[in-house]
């Protein structure tokens, strides 16, 4: 069982960024959306002090036998990652978007295993 966080390489960060959803009329190398619909900005990786900061989330948390495998990694706005924590297979996110801005919006998620 993997229990330790890891520092991701720039190559890994870029590969996970590619999983974020591209949006029409936006520069996909700069802005995309996470799975909850929150805007994230590429250069704000790891920056919790930025409005579009994002992190790499382990969909199935390491604390629940998740792995660092690419299929388990997702780009997520830091507030959604913080809200999710180690919750799995059910969790909630707290941020989505309306047009070009992020807004408070609680959504519940569930993975069928």
Where are these regions (language model features)?
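Flexible domain-boundary/linker segments
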Residues: 33, 76, 90-94
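Histidine-centered catalytic micro-motifs used for acid/base chemistry in nuclease
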Residues: 51-64, 68-78
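Polybasic, low-complexity binding patches
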Residues: 65-71, 82-113
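Short cysteine-rich loop/turn motifs with clustered Cys
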Residues: 6-54, 77
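Short, Lys/Arg-enriched charge-dense amphipathic segments
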Residues: 15, 46-60, 93-95, 109-113
């Amino acid at each position: 069982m993997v229990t330790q966080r890891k520092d991701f390489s720039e190559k890994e960060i870029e590969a996970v960024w590619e999983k974020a959803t591209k949006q029409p009329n936006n520069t996909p190398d700069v802005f995309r959306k996470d799975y909850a619909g929150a805007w994230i900005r590429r250069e704000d990786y790891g920056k919790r002090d930025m409005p579009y900061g994002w992190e790499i989330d382990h969909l199935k948390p390491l604390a629940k036998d998740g792995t660092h495998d690419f299929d388990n990694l997702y780009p997520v706005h830091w507030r959604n990652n913080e809200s999710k924590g180690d919750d799995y297979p059910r969790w909630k996110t707290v941020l989505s978007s309306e047009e070009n801005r992020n807004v408070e919006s609680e959504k519940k998620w569930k993975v069928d295993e």
